[in-house]
Amino acid sequence: MGRVIAVMDVGGTSIKTGAVRFDDGDDDSRIEVGPGLPTNSNEAADVVLDSLAAGVDAALDVAGRNVTGLAIAICGPFDVDNGISQMQGVHKFEDIFGIDLRAALRERSTVSGLPIRFARDAESAGTGEALAGAGAGVDRVLTITVGTGLGSCLTDHARPVEFIDGFGVEHLAMRETPWGGRADDVLSAHGLAERLGVDMADLRAAVEDPANADIVRDHGTRLGTFLAPVVAEFDAHVVVIGGGFSGSFGRFGPALQSAIGAVPVRPAALGPAGPLLGAAQLTFRP
């Protein structure tokens, strides 16, 4: 019969929903992507929690009656074991700091007694792409998600590597850059929006505007310059760029590749399905 996992991927601006269906004794999986919803991550706690609960209900609708669990990929810092947000000073989710999301979602959604398990969003994206996307068939894949923040995941044979010589891979975004701030602030899509003087909601249009081409290419160069020593440090065989900004890869990707050097750089191939697959795999099929 297999298992059906309802999944949602929670980012700083939007929630992606869907379901992953695993067949017993088979490595194959089927992914169904559901509706996307706004996160409202800069609103008061009640608004944010109601938005997350709406995402849960949407994912459960996609999964249907035979659902056996709920997997949530979520940005961080986040305590995935206890389901508690630790986000402060990262431009999102400030008002749900310290809240037990499992309990809050049981109160506000129809999840009832189903098991709820959390995974880091970058690890979910990286695992999905390593299993069936741009990193499939490559031993060591460094996935960088470029969205409201900057996420990082290193996989070895599609399994996350948490530490390199004692350094937590997920903390890459906290490293300082030569451009006056942490990578999370400077090299994320939020950082580019600040350079362009636009709101996040208007970033896609601004990136596509030819008048901004030089700044967008320079952003790719900066990201590649930052990542080049990381690729060597992590012994990555390919770099995959995911997150909301990956849709504009054609605008910044060549400059990024030039700055990184010989190791190939690819845009994520699975779109919203990647983190959904990865989250279900990490939480219910480890």
Segment roles from a protein language model:
Residues 84-98:
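A charged helix-plus-loop insertion that forms the helical arch/lid used to bind
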Residues 9, 71-75, 119, 142-149, ...:
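Short beta-strand segments
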Residues 1-69, 79-84, 105-116, 128-142, ...:
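ATP-binding/phosphotransfer module of carbohydrate and carboxylate kinases, centering on a glycine-rich
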Residues 152-172:
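Hydrophobic, well-structured mid-protein blocks that either form specific transmembrane helices
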Residues 76-78, 91, 122, 147-150, ...:
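Short, flexible active-site-adjacent loop segments at beta-strand->alpha-helix junctions, enriched
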Residues 117, 123:
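Glycine/small-residue-rich loop that forms an oxyanion/phosphate-binding "nest" at active or ligand-binding sites
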Residues 124-131, 151-154:
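Adenylate-forming
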